[in-house]
């Protein structure tokens, strides 16, 4: 498509401007779909025709941001906003980027074959290197669960002066995955099973995002499968959720766990989500989970994707799962 646009006659300014706007819109769609290379090429092609296109600055800055080039992203958004001072999307994205820069302090990067880790170089070099080692192990082990091995570099951000103990469960505190794996760095130790388990869990979220084409799914599927991945690195004590301790209706766990009010309740929610996913894995295997992710990537409603992947009704599954608590 990009080549066809470039072949259009663009000597006339109105034509150039129109083609640039179309390319900007296409670039935005490519970025939302996770098409990394097109997210780099299309906005640059748009800006070559018309340097004022705001969508092109949004996408190009996001491409740099996801590559942990925070300074380049900020420069790109700032330039775009100077040319489009009334553009709300650019202003908001720039504000979020500046907030992240303040949290990270003196930004440095270390890279491996598959990951690029941004961190506060004044304090976090050992934590960054420990994280890099564990993430490469997760690439192999969690990748095997999803049968998914993305091309690198996959961006990771370590936040200084925050520990896993302070954060509780990282996913619960970190919020919605936005293309970067975000972790506190204090207590990073590549030999710690807990540390390894947290990173495996977080990498599973990144693969869930990619496996579903960015469409996502219910929180209990995302968090439950991530906890299955966590057990690969950190088996921990033999704690399994049993039906008598179900604390939530399964449909309640479709929404973000960030709404849950306490660490104890959050812990029970994660156990229950993992229990539900273990039911699915026991019945349908990893191939069934892969089929579910594939159906979700089409944008189908979850109940439809569930029925197509497992050939059973989601409402019936949820009702039976909830009924286990009363047995």
Model regions and ranges:
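TPR/TPR-like (Sel1-like) alpha-helical repeat modules
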Residues: 3-6, 65, 70-89, 94-101, ...
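Helix-start (N-cap) detector for alpha-helical repeat units in TPR-like alpha-solenoids
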Residues: 13-16, 20, 54-55, 88, ...
